[in-house]
Regions:
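Short aromatic-rich membrane-water interface segments that cap or initiate transmembrane helices
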Residues: 240-252
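Multi-pass membrane glycosyltransferase architecture that uses lipid-linked
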Residues: 1-227, 232-234, 253-386
Length: 386
């Protein structure tokens, strides 16, 4: 005898709640343990802002680079920095509350998307678990204190609204770009999907970015220097295969290779938008970025994860390849940490092998996407289906 659909739905909801409860409990345990160098930047930037200092024009004593983003996440941190200063509760704990919220929002939107796309309770629970309980996601957010999932959640929600032809999609996409830079990489696909609403999308996106940046428009040159120039002049680093060139040629030639690859990436992002469904396009564009970026930090590997989960169930022909790539992203992001292995920050075998895997999976995505488009194409006039 089959299980009634209502009972099955309640059981699936209970399992999803359990996944969320376990994930939140693990995060609560990880949050107070430590914080990474990036989190020091959030701490110093929010402290300086509460003191009335323009952090773009007058940098606090950052341990590394500047706060290289538009100020949306900074605004989210301000009330928690104020609470830390007035209650004695550690900012390591309070400052990670928006990060925790980003993780939970990602899980909830991903679960809703899986439910809508598959109608499969098992897919909803398992897919949400793959993201929310992923060790790299846990390390990057709750442990280290990076806020990538805030931007990922906003982008996921914007795409969900865009597919439903909601005018508010532009608002949420603008917030995603204002949180972190990477959502702007998929702009060609967003524009393609927004047929009939492109002018509204442009107005909304521009308006959001102007409103978020308004307090710093008087120092816009300094802000753009921190956001754009700081990354543009970097040498290859971390998990990028371009680190293999360092020491074998001049740093100027290495940077030139990076600029050429950036140009190729921008061209590729436009061409992919003409050929792929939006979900596959976002995933393919982010994977292409992993190949072309001259700096590849483990946090970048979190960006494509929700779309890997979606493609896992919506593209069954390439399920094995998607599972393999998802596993590789997770393992590489964790193992390439010099604190847990002896090969340093950019181990040659890992960075070269991962680049090859990215290229292979990118080809798989494009080929499968084109095959699916061909299968869905209407028959020529007069042709009969076999």
């Amino acid at each position: 005898m089959g299980v009634p659909s209502g009972t099955a739905g309640q059981a699936a909801s209970a399992r999803l709640v359990l996944v969320l409860a376990v994930g939140i409990a693990v995060r609560v345990a990880l949050i107070p343990i430590t914080r990474g160098q990036d989190f020091e930047v959030w701490d110093l930037a929010s402290t300086a802002t509460l003191q009335g200092i323009d952090i773009y024009a007058h940098h606090p004593a950052y341990p590394g680079g500047p706060y290289a983003y538009l100020p949306l996440f900074l605004y989210l941190e301000l009330p928690f920095q104020w609470l830390a200063e007035h209650t004695g509760i550690s900012f390591t704990v309070l400052g990670k509350v928006p990060v925790l919220a980003g993780d939970i929002a990602c899980a909830l939107v991903l679960a809703a998307e899986l439910r809508d796309r598959t109608g499969n309770n098992r897919a909803v629970v398992l897919g949400t678990s793959l993201f929310f309980l992923n060790p790299l996601v846990l390390y990057n957010g709750a442990f280290y204190g990076r806020f990538d999932t805030v931007a990922v959640a906003l982008l996921l929600f914007a795409v969900r609204l865009l597919r439903r032809r909601k005018r508010s999609a532009g608002l949420w996409y603008g917030l995603a770009v204002a949180a972190k830079t990477f959502p702007v990489f998929v702009l060609p696909g967003i524009v393609r999907e927004a047929r009939g609403r492109r002018i509204w999308l442009a107005i909304t996106l521009t308006g959001v970015l102007l409103v978020v940046s308004a307090p710093y428009l008087s120092s816009w040159r300094a802000m753009m220097s921190d956001i754009v120039v700081y990354d543009a002049v970097k040498a290859p680093g971390a998990l990028s295969w371009q680190t293999l060139f360092i020491g074998s040629t001049s740093i100027e030639k290495v940077r030139l290779v990076g600029y050429v690859l950036l140009a190729l990436y921008l061209i590729g992002a436009v061409l992919l938008a003409r050929a792929l469904d939006l979900d596959v396009y976002i995933l393919a564009t982010l994977v292409l970025f992993l190949v072309c970026s001259k700096v590849l930090l483990e946090q970048y590997l979190v960006w494509p994860m929700p779309w890997l989960v979606l493609v896992l169930w919506t593209a069954p022909r390439i399920r094995a390849a998607t599972i393999a790539f998802f596993g590789a992203v997770t393992v590489v992001g964790m193992v390439a940490n010099p604190h847990i292995q002896p090969w340093g920050r950019s181990p040659a075998l890992i960075v070269a092998g991962f680049a090859v895997l990215c290229v292979i999976y990118l080809v798989v995505l494009v080929v499968d996407g084109r095959r699916r488009d061909s299968a869905l194409a209407p028959e020529p006039n007069g042709a009969q289906a076999k």
